[in-house]
Amino acid sequence: MSRVVVIGATGHIGTYLVPRLVDGGHEVIAVSRGTRGPYHASPQWDAVTRVTADREAEDAAGRFGDRIAALRPEAVIDLICFTPASARQLTEALRPSRPLLVHCGTIWVHGPALRVPVTEDEPRTAYGEYGTGKAEIEALLNQETRAGGVPAVVLHPGHISGPGWPVITPAGNLDAAAWTQLATGRPLTLPDHGLGVLHHVHADDVAQAFELALSRPAAIGGSFHVVAEQAMTLRGLAAGVARWFGREPVLDFVGWDEFTRRAGPGDAEVTREHTFRSITASIARAREVLGYAPRYSSLDALREALAWLVADGQADIGDQPFPGR
């Protein structure tokens, strides 16, 4: 058993991770802004110590790292660190006590793939604020570990999916109309022949990897992809979803200009951000070192997500029967 501080404890990953840690016998301190509970209630949360903190404000005031260190953690799981300055403040505060630090990165530390599957050893070619920030944090934490400071592990999830929030659809964005079109047999517009690649992962599989990292000393100083066993193309995801409803997908392949006109600039840009990378991430290292074994395929994760979205009124599948509806 260890004393584990989870930062961002009530988010997508923490909702699944905190109960896992409690079941594993850990003493858990859950840090969040306190504005809402986890996405799904479970009795394990009754055994958790809750701490309310606004990281952005406390980072700006220079207090957040010291606040976490004062909790006397043996391990810190940081699910919401997005800037090198934030990571630096935390590691400097933790350096005297040197707890294990497990950081949530992203497969977007990789830019457009040159070889597939992409391994953790590929040179970092991130672009955009989110990906480059995470790549810089990864480099900072690796250097921290090599220098004998805070021992760190970095986990890189794909597109985190599951019940409780909107997820990236087979159109590569968050527009729920894609679910309606696939369920009811209406045409779904896709760019580039639908060959853009997405690599989803169920939030509970991400939680599994974080839990495993706490007990794998060989993981220290390493980075690991945490995704479903296989990535899928947009057209493959569309076919899988349509078949839940006994259909073959009706797909309308167009160029980017026409896709942008139909989808709108905002949704088209989200699709472009995902498909221009088209990352297929290898999990061989996570399997070998962490013992990571994802339970959910990409379609499994989307199926659970869609069942929840339909039940919550956020997705319309018409009169189609759907398991879990």
Please tell me what each predicted stretch does.
Residues 4-24:
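N-terminal Rossmann NAD(P)H-binding glycine-rich loop of SDR-like oxidoreductase domains
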Residues 69-116, 132-142:
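NAD(P)-cofactor binding segment of oxidoreductase domains
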Residues 106-129, 145-148, 165:
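Active-site "gating" loop of Rossmann-like NAD(P)-dependent oxidoreductase/epimerase domains
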Residues 139-167:
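Conserved beta-loop-beta element that borders a ligand/cofactor-binding pocket
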Residues 162, 190-196, 224-231, 240-243, ...:
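Glycine-rich Rossmann NAD(P)(H)-binding loop
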Residues 170-178, 190-214, 221-222:
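Substrate-positioning beta->alpha
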Residues 203, 260-293, 314:
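Conserved C-terminal active-site "lid" loop/helix of NAD(P)H-dependent oxidoreductases
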Residues 212-271, 304-306, 316-324:
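Mid/C-terminal beta-alpha module of Rossmann-like enzyme folds, strongest
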